Amino acid sequence: PFFYALRREAHFTDERYSLHDNTQLYLSFDFNKSPSTLVIGMIYQKEIAIIDLIICDENSVQGKSPLEACCFKFKEKYLSSGLITRPYLIVTGDASGTAGGSDKVKNENFYTKIESILGIGKSQRKIRKKNIEHILSQEICNSLIYNCNFKIYKSAELVLFDMEQAQIENGKLVKGDRDKGKGLDITDAVRYFMDCV
């Protein structure tokens, strides 16, 4: 398994998470045409936790791309409700999201779009210049799971299922058919979160 240190009985909790004062939330994105995946992680004292998951496709919010829909759903649930304030957000994710494309406006990318929708600054972005190799990511993730008070809360139970399915072969994460829910987009977003902590 990719996450060989992960143990359901030790790392999954049925409890509801609570956001304490000064809790930082990490928003970890995996960008795909569809769906876009947002894993929400929390760091508080010695606890590193995954507290929520938002997955959106082109039908999630009318007139919005999957990425925009993820951002709007997060904004509604966490910012508009007052659960957290903008200064405590850190955005991370797939390093390819900093690249432009043929349909992109100059100096715009996935991260500038996220920052614009959430009303946060570039200084709250924590992105590697390029994604690290899967084999190194595996060691970082398992070291964190083993050595920290790592939890996955019930509100993010799908994260646990995806992590349990993740396999590595010849130094690469084995990905299945995205249409059958085996694209491991959630696992990728989890890796980006753990790699930046």
Where are these regions (language model features)?
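Short beta-strand scaffold segments in enzyme catalytic cores
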Residues: S36-M42
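Acidic, Mg2+-coordinating catalytic module of metal-dependent nucleases/exonucleases
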Residues: G176-V197
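Solvent-exposed strand-loop boundary residues in beta-sheet-rich modules
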Residues: Y44-K46
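Residue-level detector of short, conserved catalytic/binding motifs and their immediate flanks
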Residues: L25, S36, L89, T187
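Mg2+-dependent endonuclease catalytic cores in nucleic-acid-processing enzymes, primarily RNase H-like
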Residues: I48-D179
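ATPase catalytic-site recognition across NTP-hydrolyzing enzymes
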Residues: P1-F29, S34
